[in-house]
């Protein structure tokens, strides 16, 4: 059975007081102050134990306003968790519902996958690095979240080609891309949402794209941020004179 928010809350209540204080301060001083006010999101970030997904050497920073390192992937690129405030802002924008099916690209530690899975019907989460995906599976098992399918693949173009006919209510990338990969928005159901961080450092923007009809889409820029680029992300073509 999928772990419920109530069960997770009971689980985290057993943590020692200093950790609980750090978690409270994370929510009140980092997340709320970044205009994340949705009570469901705030409760979720309190209930899903972030520290269970943080590497042992960074446990003291589990609730800090930083992108916690996860080590290097097979190509030597540094991987990291999203900062807590960015996790909250993205969740608030997506407004995930319990009947929804989600595609998540960039599993990482599995924590953001866990947040999504605690709200949704099912999450398909893609990670290009096999070691990270394996660790994410262990982390998710620690908190009894099992409505997740983990896939080791290059997810820059969305779902694997052998699932090309599957559409999602929500698609979210937790890494950046200089430009939107072709064909990803077409993997949404009508009414579905795609959230990506687009651009090159230091000028990146979180964009929310909604499919409003079979061929129509609406795009809104939510906020400015900066994230490491996903491997094999499409580059902006530059004109040569």
Annotated model-derived regions:
Residues 241:
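Catalytic, metal-anchored helix/loop core of enzyme active sites in primary metabolism
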Residues 91-217:
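Conserved nucleotide-cofactor-binding alpha/beta core module
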Residues 2-103, 111, 115, 119, ...:
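Class I SAM-dependent transferase core
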């Amino acid at each position: 059975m999928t772990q419920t928010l109530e069960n997770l809350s009971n689980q985290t209540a057993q943590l020692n007081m200093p950790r609980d204080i750090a978690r409270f301060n994370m929510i009140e001083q980092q997340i709320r102050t970044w205009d994340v006010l949705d009570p469901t999101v705030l409760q979720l970030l309190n209930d899903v134990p972030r520290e269970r997904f943080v590497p042992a050497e960074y446990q003291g920073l589990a609730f800090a306003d930083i992108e916690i390192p996860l080590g290097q992937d097979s190509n030597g690129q540094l991987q990291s968790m999203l900062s807590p405030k960015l996790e909250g802002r993205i969740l608030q924008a997506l407004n995930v519902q319990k009947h929804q099916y989600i595609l998540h690209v960039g599993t990482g530690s599995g924590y953001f996958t866990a947040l999504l899975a605690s709200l949704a019907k099912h999450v398909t989460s893609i990670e290009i690095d096999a070691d990270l995906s394996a660790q994410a599976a262990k982390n998710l098992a620690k908190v009894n979240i099992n409505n997740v399918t983990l896939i080791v693949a290059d997810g820059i173009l969305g779902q694997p080609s052998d699932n090309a006919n599957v559409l999602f209510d929500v698609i979210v990338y937790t890494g950046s891309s200089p430009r939107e990969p072709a064909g990803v928005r077409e993997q949404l159901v009508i009414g579905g949402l795609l959230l990506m961080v687009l651009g090159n450092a230091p000028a990146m923007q979180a964009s929310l794209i909604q499919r409003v009809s079979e061929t129509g889409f609406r795009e809104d820029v939510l906020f400015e941020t900066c994230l490491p680029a996903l491997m094999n992300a499409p580059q902006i073509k530059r004109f040569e004179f």
